């Protein structure tokens, strides 16, 4: 149902007002069999309870000088509320209440006096007077300004003089400087001599001796032509293996060194790589300052022949040992440069290896250890080459046996 239909079906307000005025006589109103005694019944002196002696405080009452009709409110519609309800007095059987006042032992709280009088600032406390600078003491002049002269006209661009050292405190002796510790001498200057009596400390001459001139050596290159810097290429070896092979030692026809797979790789046009100047590889745990020698081993049916190049070595500085358990030949010693001490100080290029050397060569193949006569080993040093001969007791007859699974 729409709102318009509801408005059409709802009875008008005049109908409801007529029903209220007529009461039970209205045709649409039916009397209740048991009427409510507490129901509000509009009457001049009734509040809603039958027999109440006081008028209702909520009923509209006329104002002073207003002639409105309380029944139908013909003039105006009681725009102002009713006057406040007067106190009816105590209930029946109760005496009127009277304020007893303050008890005799407790006087009323007096109003503070300081709030009645205007507040005035008392000033600082007696023990807290405002500070007044008395000025400098009689025996102490004021601190002068470092930038202004005494007459106040000429400025000074320098600060005041430093405060002098007052000396040690009371009860303390002056600390004498004992000097340098006997076991810790002052570090000498490398640019001045130790003699402090002369006046040549300002010359700046070095106290350490001058080293002989050595041209710069580019790492990992060789000598090309007669001029330029002499580039050095030390040989790189792998310990425990023999160098060379079917191609032999030295330089090949295409211009690069014939090396095995254990050597440092080289460029095919003869220019070695930069990392070819690394020190020889040593296994972990093997630390020795002696360098490895290049050896040639010849295996003949009668003996093993080993050639070791030792240029500049002497017989008394070379030692050859034989280990029968490991079937290993050991060669060690030292190689030095001939000449006087003064000549060795003037060296300008050192490409030859000198110093201690050590090399161990294991004889035989992987099949079995060869049978050699350790008492008949001979060695000789001729033309800078050490020749060691190890004779065999039996010819090599190694047979390969087939194992049946």
UniProtKB/Swiss-Prot annotation:
Bias-annotated ranges (Gly residues): 242-252
Nuclease listed as a keyword: no
Family annotation (Gene3D superfamilies): 2.60.40.790
Gene that this polypeptide is encoded by: AacuJ
Applications (biotechnology): Secalonic acids show unprecedented anticancer activities against various human cancer cells and might be interesting for further derivatization, targeting diseases such as cancer.
InterPro entries reported in the protein's UniProt record: A-crystallin/Hsp20_dom, HSP20-like_chaperone, Small_HSP
Protein's UniProt name: SHSP domain-containing protein AacuJ
Organism listed in the record: Aspergillus aculeatus (strain ATCC 16872 / CBS 172.66 / WB 5094)
Similarity section: Belongs to the small heat shock protein (HSP20) family.
């Amino acid at each position: 149902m729409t709102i318009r239909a509801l408005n059409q079906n709802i009875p008008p307000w005049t109908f409801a007002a007529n029903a209220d005025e007529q009461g039970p006589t209205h045709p649409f109103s039916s009397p209740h069999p048991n009427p409510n005694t507490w129901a509000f019944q509009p009457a001049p002196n009734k509040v809603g309870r039958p027999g109440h002696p006081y008028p209702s405080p909520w009923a509209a009452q006329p104002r002073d000088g207003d002639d409105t009709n309380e029944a139908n409110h013909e003039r105006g519609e009681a725009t102002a509320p009713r006057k406040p309800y007067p106190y009816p007095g105590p209930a029946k059987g109760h005496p009127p209440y009277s304020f007893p006042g303050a008890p005799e032992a407790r006087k009323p709280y007096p109003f503070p006096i300081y709030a009645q009088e205007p507040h005035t600032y008392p000033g600082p406390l007696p023990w807290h007077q405002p500070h007044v600078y008395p000025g400098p003491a009689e025996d102490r002049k004021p601190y002068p300004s470092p930038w202004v002269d005494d007459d106040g006209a000429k400025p000074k661009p320098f600060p005041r003089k430093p405060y002098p050292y007052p000396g040690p405190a009371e009860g303390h002796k002056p600390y004498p400087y004992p000097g340098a510790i006997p076991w810790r001498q002052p570090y000498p200057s490398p640019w001045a001599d130790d003699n402090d009596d002369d006046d040549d400390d300002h010359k700046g001459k070095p106290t350490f001796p001058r080293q002989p001139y050595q041209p710069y050596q580019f790492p990992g290159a060789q000598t090309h032509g007669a001029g330029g810097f002499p580039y050095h290429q030390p040989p790189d070896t792998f310990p425990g293996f023999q160098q060379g092979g079917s191609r032999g030692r030295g330089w090949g026809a295409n211009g690069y060194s014939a090396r095995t797979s254990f050597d440092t790789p080289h460029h095919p046009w003869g220019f070695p790589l930069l990392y070819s100047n690394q020190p020889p590889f040593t296994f972990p745990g093997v630390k020795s300052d002696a360098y490895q020698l290049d050896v040639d081993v010849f295996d003949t049916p009668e003996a093993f022949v080993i050639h070791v190049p030792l240029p500049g070595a002497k017989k008394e500085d070379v030692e050859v040992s034989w280990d029968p358990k490991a079937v290993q030949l050991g060669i060690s010693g030292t190689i030095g440069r001939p000449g006087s001490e003064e000549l060795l100080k003037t060296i300008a290029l050192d490409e030859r290896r000198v110093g201690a050397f050590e090399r161990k060569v294991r004889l035989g193949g992987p099949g079995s250890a060869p049978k050699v006569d350790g008492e008949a080993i001979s060695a000789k040093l001729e033309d800078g080459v050490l020749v060691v001969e190890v004779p065999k007791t039996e010819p090599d007859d190694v047979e390969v046996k087939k194992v049946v699974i």
